Amino acid sequence: MTEEAATSKILLFNKWDMSEVVVKDAGMVRYVTITSTEVPSSCGRLTQQQFTKSEMAIVERLINRLMQQEYNTGKKMMCTKMVMDAFDVINKKTKQNPLQVLVDAVANAGPREETVRLKYGGINVPKSVDSAPIRRVNTALRYIALATWKGSHKTKKPAYLVLADELIMAAKGDAKCFSVGKKEEVERIAKSAR
């Protein structure tokens, strides 16, 4: 690699190389977008059409999801700083690329099966259905953001530490973390509704 090519490589937050991140779940490859940008912000360009949010970088989608929780509403810089600090903590604890940890956490926290209500003769009957890959990603990000808010609300522990711990445990598939536990609960309910 030439010196010019090495210096022109774009790193996320000027620290993390996105080219070495691999999505291991084959169904989610199209919907977990890993683009090379320094600061993940599309400025709302990808919200004009229905399914274009799947082209948005996964880090930006996490930041946007964190912005939708209670007291973080609309505070993008605060949520971006939270994700940056969480990525630093993840790197110190696991010695891995935090983007890979995020991708693994999203793959492990998204439920593969859910239930819907069908109406048969005035009676609601739960029916098990497979989740679409984009819904799995959206649900996983929602669970991770909810776990971050619940873990840091009315406690002394900062939100970035809660986010880092949640991502590390979800990447390992640990059922003690909120997002994986919630996924297993949804899948258990779906299994009983088959």
UniProtKB/Swiss-Prot annotation:
GO biological process entries: translation
Domain of life: Archaea
UniProt keywords, alphabetically: Ribonucleoprotein, Ribosomal protein, RNA-binding, rRNA-binding
GO cellular component: small ribosomal subunit
Residues forming coiled coils: none
PROSITE patterns (alphabetical): RIBOSOMAL_S7
UniProt GO MF annotations: rRNA binding; structural constituent of ribosome
Disulfide links within the chain: none
SUPFAM superfamilies in the cross-refs: Ribosomal protein S7
NCBIfam families the UniProt entry points to: PRK04027.1, uS7_euk_arch
Family indicated by similarity: Belongs to the universal ribosomal protein uS7 family.
Assembly mode: Part of the 30S ribosomal subunit.
Function statement: One of the primary rRNA binding proteins, it binds directly to 16S rRNA where it nucleates assembly of the head domain of the 30S subunit. Is located at the subunit interface close to the decoding center.
Protein name in UniProt: Small ribosomal subunit protein uS7
